[in-house]
Regions:
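Glycine/small-residue-rich loop that forms an oxyanion/phosphate-binding "nest" at active or ligand-binding sites
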Residues: 70, 74-77
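Short, surface-exposed acidic-centric catalytic microdomains
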Residues: 30-58, 63-68
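Conserved small/polar residues in nucleotide/adenosyl-binding loops
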Residues: 128-131
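Alpha-helical oligomerization interface recognition
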Residues: 86-126
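N-terminal glycine-rich "phosphate-gripper" loop used for MgATP/nucleotide binding
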Residues: 37-38, 61-62, 66, 80-96, ...
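N-terminal Rossmann-like dinucleotide-binding module
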Residues: 1-43
Length: 131
C-alpha cells in the first residue's frame, strides 16, 4: 500500500479529486495517510476531516524563522512515513532538505506553465495580467 501525504494551502479541489479517485478505485493500492496545510481554516482541512484523513497545520506564522518552519514541516511529514508526497496547490517553497530526503517521491500539481508563470505574486490576479 502506497502511503501518500498531500500538502495544501487552500480549498483543496485537487485534494478532493485525489480522495475521490482513491475512494472509487481509480487510484489503487494507495492510502492517504495525512494532509498538511500551511494555513488554518482552509476548506482542504474540512475535506480531509470529512474523508477521515488525519490533517495538520504547519504554518510559517507559528515559527520564529524560515529554518524553524522548514524543520517543523519536515518533522510533520516524516511522522507519516510517506512513500509519496503530493503538493496539491501548496503555496510554499519547499526546503531543499525535503527535496533531498524525498527525491523522486514528490509530485507537484501546478496550475500554470513553469517557469513562465510561477513564483511570488503569480497566485491570483497577477496570473491574468501576465503576457
Amino acid at each position: 500500500m502506497l502511503r501518500v501525504v498531500v500538502c495544501v494551502s487552500g480549498g483543496g479541489t485537487n485534494l478532493q479529486a485525489i480522495i475521490d479517485a482513491v475512494a472509487d478505485g481509480t487510484i489503487t493500492n494507495t492510502e492517504l495517510v495525512g494532509v498538511i496545510s500551511n494555513n488554518y481554516g482552509v476548506r482542504a482541512l474540512e475535506r480531509a476531516e470529512k474523508a477521515g484523513i488525519d490533517a495538520k497545520v504547519v504554518s510559517p506564522k507559528d515559527y520564529e524563522n524560515r529554518a524553524a518552519f522548514n524543520e517543523g514541516l519536515l518533522t510533520t511529514i516524516r511522522a507519516y512515513k510517506p512513500d509519496l508526497i503530493v503538493l496539491a496547490g501548496f503555496l510554499v517553497v519547499i526546503p531543499e532538505a525535503m527535496i533531498e530526503e524525498y527525491e523522486n517521491r514528490i509530485i507537484n500539481i501546478h496550475p500554470s506553465l513553469i517557469p513562465s508563470f510561477c513564483g511570488t505574486g503569480y497566485y491570483g490576479c497577477l496570473l491574468y495580467t501576465s503576457p
